């Protein structure tokens, strides 16, 4: 086992604090509308330029192992805030730094670390309640646009495109961000349900120019088994041919004689038909087939419930306005499903999400919910250079997470004002003893830090602005973008409640662990074993080899 280095008490805390401050000082320069860029060197390719706090935090590794432990713990704050709310990483880092700095001063003055931590925790619980009380629900597109704009570092075009995407596919719809080919941002919306399964045979293609299958007003047959015998499909094919409509078959698989016969019928024009595999596997496939059935007012043909494929009638088939099938995807547009049935299915999936304890299951259920609740929107990022593209894509993804968080829990006044008001709301809170009360005051002072940092990044005087904001009420605050005071909500400066809440909770949690640290252990540096052995004696010995040539 490798030897270890151990530090105790104040020596350990001083080293840890140095690491905390190095990381936090690099991250906090990005905060606010006038936050600065950070340039990160990469071992390959050009440097990255970013204003994203978590990107900066993830790049920092310190040489001193004790200092690095402090830096990594603050990095954890940024990562947790990012995972929970998708934004607020810089705010969380600034809060953690403030709590650790204030707390360690108190410990150095002789206060009990455990009571200090209890006081901080008590203050945070009360502050979170105050934040929730001041939260305003997001009901209109304008608020979504404002949240997106603020999160994307005051880029109004980003706010607008996210608001438009949410308007088109719904707040629970699928919105993806990808790199585009143009200089400007573009929004591509796919109305309806899309899943990752393409046509089973290229002979189904009827749009040669783009290599897709397009079916207008098709019947949709949903089967929860493999189809290899064409006899099972004859009744359905005859009924569809008489109705004069195309047919889409979605089954576990279509193979052998059945697939060959479908291809021949399609090429001869007897029945316009296409077949795709059902999405997912096992129980998830069954559930997704049922989702499609709900969307298209069809029935899943399953032998488990006693239904036979040979006895299918046109009433069992689903219908949609249009279906587009490519090599890899199937899009069902405008299914004729009853709205009440679709909403009931959506509610059922929401219930399953709440009951599920697996992150993977939750993610898959969320995908199903999005497919049913709305279409799919793709935001294509435009930029002049690859470096700008990557920086902008990161900002748009942050803004998208922030707007989702805003829809979930509402919004509060931005610019650090909500935390100032929450701090004012808990100023009379007292702990069980003097040290706990001091811990509450540590948290209250730390909650001023984000506003102070935003103002400092603008080049203004933090204390002057803080006093002015303190003297105001409600949403009155400081607009760092143009150095004016006013109602933050009316000026469109909003923060999602979830982002502010998560930043405060995670910062206090990790800072509390640091304050109660009494020892730090790390691997001792490996001492150099010395240089290469002396080989000078080999010269003479090898000289005798000359006679062998």
Swiss-Prot record:
Domain of life: Bacteria
CDD domains: GroEL (cd03344)
InterPro entries: Chaperonin_Cpn60_CS, Cpn60/GroEL, Cpn60/GroEL/TCP-1, GroEL-like_apical_dom_sf, GROEL-like_equatorial_sf, TCP-1-like_intermed_sf
Record's GO cellular component terms: cytoplasm
Pfam families in the record: Cpn60_TCP1 (PF00118)
Binding site for ATP: 30-33, 51, 87-91, 415, 495
Keywords: ATP-binding, Chaperone, Cytoplasm, Isomerase, Nucleotide-binding
Molecular functions (GO terms): ATP binding; ATP-dependent protein folding chaperone; isomerase activity; unfolded protein binding
Catalysis: reaction(s): ATP + H2O + a folded polypeptide = ADP + phosphate + an unfolded polypeptide
Listed EC numbers: 5.6.1.7
Subcellular location per the Swiss-Prot or TrEMBL entry: Cytoplasm
Predominant cellular place of this UniProt entry's protein: cytoplasm
An annotated GO BP: protein refolding
Function: Together with its co-chaperonin GroES, plays an essential role in assisting protein folding. The GroEL-GroES system forms a nano-cage that allows encapsulation of the non-native substrate proteins and provides a physical environment optimized to promote and accelerate protein folding.
Family: Belongs to the chaperonin (HSP60) family.
NCBIfam families for the chain: GroEL (TIGR02348), PRK00013.1 (NF000592), PRK12849.1 (NF009487), PRK12850.1 (NF009488), PRK12851.1 (NF009489)
Protein name: Chaperonin GroEL
Species of the source: Colwellia maris
Name of the coding gene: groEL
């Amino acid at each position: 086992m490798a030897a270890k280095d151990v530090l105790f008490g104040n020596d350990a805390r001083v080293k840890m604090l140095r690491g905390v401050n190095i990381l936090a000082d690099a991250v906090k320069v990005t905060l606010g509308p006038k936050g600065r860029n950070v340039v990160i060197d990469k071992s390959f390719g050009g440097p990255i330029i970013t204003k994203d706090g978590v990107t900066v935090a993830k790049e920092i590794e310190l040489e001193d192992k004790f200092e690095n432990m402090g830096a990594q713990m603050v990095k954890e704050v940024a990562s947790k805030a990012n995972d929970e709310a998708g934004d607020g990483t810089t705010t969380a880092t600034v809060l953690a730094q403030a709590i650790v700095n204030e707390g360690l001063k108190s410990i150095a003055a002789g206060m009990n670390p455990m009571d200090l931590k209890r006081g901080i925790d008590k203050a945070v619980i009360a502050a979170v309640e105050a934040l929730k009380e001041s939260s305003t629900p997001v009901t209109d597109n304008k608020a979504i646009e404002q949240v997106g704009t603020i999160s994307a570092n005051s880029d109004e075009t980003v706010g607008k495109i996210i608001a438009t995407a949410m308007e088109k596919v719904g707040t629970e719809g699928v919105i993806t961000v990808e790199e585009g080919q143009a200089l400007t941002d573009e929004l591509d919306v796919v109305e309806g349900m899309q899943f990752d399964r393409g046509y089973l045979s290229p002979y189904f293609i009827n749009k040669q120019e783009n290599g897709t299958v397009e079916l207008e007003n098709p019947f949709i047959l949903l089967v929860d088994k493999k189809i290899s015998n064409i006899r099972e499909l004859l009744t359905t094919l005859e009924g569809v041919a008489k109705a004069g409509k195309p047919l889409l078959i979605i089954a576990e698989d279509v193979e052998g004689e059945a697939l060959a016969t479908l291809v021949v019928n399609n090429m001869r024009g007897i029945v316009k038909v296409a077949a795709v595999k059902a999405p997912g596997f096992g129980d998830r496939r069954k559930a997704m087939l049922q989702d499609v059935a709900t969307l298209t007012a069809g029935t899943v043909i399953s032998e488990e419930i006693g239904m036979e494929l040979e006895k299918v009638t046109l009433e069992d088939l689903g219908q949609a306005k249009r279906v587009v099938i490519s090599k890899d995807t199937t899009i069902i547009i405008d299914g004729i499903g009853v709205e009440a049935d679709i909403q009931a299915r959506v509610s059922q999936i929401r219930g399953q999400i709440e009951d599920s304890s697996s992150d993977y299951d939750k993610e898959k259920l969320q995908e199903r919910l999005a497919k049913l609740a709305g279409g799919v929107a793709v935001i294509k990022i435009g930029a002049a250079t690859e470096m700008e593209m990557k920086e902008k894509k990161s900002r748009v993804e942050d803004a998208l997470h922030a707007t989702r968080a805003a829809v979930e829990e509402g919004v509060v006044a931005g610019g650090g004002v909500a935390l100032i008001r929450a701090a004012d709301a808990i100023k009379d809170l007292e702990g069980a003893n003097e040290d706990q009360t001091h811990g509450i005051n540590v948290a209250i002072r730390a909650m001023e830090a984000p506003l102070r940092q935003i103002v400092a990044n603008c080049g203004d005087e933090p204390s002057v602005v803080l006093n002015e904001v303190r003297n105001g009420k409600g949403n009155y605050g400081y607009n760092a973008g143009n150095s004016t005071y006013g109602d933050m909500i009316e000026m469109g400066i909003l923060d999602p409640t979830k982002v502010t809440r998560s930043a405060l909770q995670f910062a206090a949690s990790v800072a509390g662990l640091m304050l109660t640290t009494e020892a730090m252990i790390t691997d001792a540096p490996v001492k150099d074993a010395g240089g290469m052995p002396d080989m000078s004696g080999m010269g003479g010995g090898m000289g005798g080899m000359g006679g062998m040539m």
